[in-house]
A protein has these predicted regions:
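Conserved acidic residues
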Residues: 5, 30, 86-87
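Flexible loop/turn connectors
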Residues: 83-87, 91-174
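A generic structural signal for alpha->beta connector loops
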Residues: 4, 59-61, 109, 127
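Hinge/beta->alpha junction and helix N-cap segments in small-molecule ligand-binding domains
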Residues: 7-18, 34-56, 60-77, 90-97, ...
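Phosphate/pyrophosphate-binding loops at sites that engage ATP/ADP/AMP, CoA/4′-phosphopantetheine
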Residues: 26-27, 80-83
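Nucleotide donor/acceptor-binding cores
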Residues: 21-32
Length: 174
C-alpha cells in the first residue's frame, strides 16, 4: 500500500476467529479440521492466523488442509479427514458446502462453518455459521475513498465490520 492506495476489508483474522469460536463453543468441540484457502494467499494467511490463535486460546487440536476455495477439493478433504474431528471450519462458504456434502454422504454429523455469507448457503439443508461481509457498505466506502483520492487525499487502510450469521432459505427467497 502507498499514499495513493486505499485498502478496504474486514479484519480477516478476527472474523475467522469469531465464526470458528462460536461454532466450536456451541458444540463443545476440541478437534478441528480447518480447510484453508489457497496456499500463500494473503486472505488464507490472515484467516489461518485467526485459527491458530483460537486453537491456543481454547486449547484445541487442529489439522490444517488446503481447500483452494474449491467445493470439490473441500469435499475430498472432508471425506478423508473429518471422521476423527469434532468440527470442520472452512475458509469459505463454498468449501463449507463441499465439506457438508461429504459429511452427509458419510452419514455423520459434524458442525461446519464457512466464511463469506454467500446466498448459496441458504440452499444447504443444514444452517451453518458464516461470516457476512456487508458488501453494500464496503462498496459505498470504496466510492468515498476513490473520490477522496481523486481530490488529492491520501490512501489508508479501512477495516469494516463483520457479523456472524446463519443463512436460512426463507431469508433468500423473494
Amino acid at each position: 500500500m502507498n499514499a495513493r492506495t486505499t485498502y478496504i476489508s474486514i479484519d480477516q483474522e478476527q472474523a475467522q476467529y469469531d465464526v470458528a469460536k462460536k461454532t466450536v463453543l456451541d458444540d463443545n468441540c476440541k478437534r478441528v479440521l480447518y480447510i484453508a484457502g489457497r496456499r500463500d494467499g494473503y486472505v488464507t494467511e490472515q484467516r489461518l492466523k485467526g485459527m491458530k490463535r483460537l486453537v491456543k486460546d481454547l486449547d484445541l487440536t487442529m489439522m490444517v488442509r488446503q481447500g483452494d476455495f474449491s467445493e470439490l477439493t473441500a469435499r475430498n478433504v472432508a471425506l478423508k479427514y473429518a471422521k476423527n474431528k469434532d468440527v470442520v471450519v472452512c475458509a469459505s462458504d463454498l468449501m463449507a458446502i463441499g465439506a457438508m456434502n461429504a459429511l452427509i454422504d458419510m452419514d455423520i454429523f459434524r458442525p461446519v462453518c464457512g466464511f463469506d455469507g454467500i446466498t448459496l448457503m441458504g440452499y444447504v439443508g443444514k444452517q451453518m455459521n458464516t461470516i457476512r461481509q456487508d458488501f453494500y457498505s464496503i462498496s459505498s466506502r470504496a466510492v468515498e475513498e476513490v473520490h477522496q483520492l481523486m481530490n488529492g487525499g491520501e490512501g489508508h487502510q479501512v477495516i469494516m465490520p463483520h457479523s456472524i450469521v446463519k443463512m436460512y432459505y426463507k431469508d433468500i427467497i423473494c
